Amino acid sequence: MEKTACLIVDVQQSVVSALPDGGEELTEKLSRLITWCRQQMVPLVYIRHDDGEDRISEIDSRIKPKESEIVMDKSYPSAFLETDLESWCSEQGITQLIVAGMMTEFCIDATIKSAFERGYQVLVPQGCCATVDNEYLTAQQTEEFFEKRIWQGRYAQIFSLESLLSQPVKK
């Protein structure tokens, strides 16, 4: 039986503000996911990238964690490298992770692959990861490429947010 936790990765004010709509679409979807997790009693772990600047570490206020929810800081793309995430998951009996958040091609990708390498089943709700345009691909192209070509069937299962929210989780 799977025990699930949800990782909200790098949804920080300075990063989200770089999205064309200021993060409205992403934070709306994440709010729905977070509400579902809270209702299902799925633990939420907020991951912040900490590079020493106060402003960049602030989680976007639209998805602010509750005091009882876990916030972990990281210094590398993977949420597992030099953090307490793996030991926390082990202590909680977590075997399945829902991964969502910012910078699809960097921190989300690194976290998904690290989770897979550690034996976790990984779920990624479509539209709950985001990035910005780069010189090669638009943000949408990057997100679709990672979801359909890199992660699906290899490192993670990709689901529509609606289908995920309609299913009870295994506790």
Question: Can you name each region flagged by the protein language model?
Answer:
Residues E2-A5, R32, Q40, G52-K171:
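Active-site-adjacent betaalpha module
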Residues V11, H49, G127:
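Active-site loop/turn elements of alpha/beta-hydrolase fold enzymes
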Residues A5-V11:
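N-terminal nucleotide-binding beta1-loop-alpha1 segment
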Residues Q13-A18:
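Short acidic, Gly/Ser-rich segments with clustered Asp/Glu that frequently serve as metal-coordination loops
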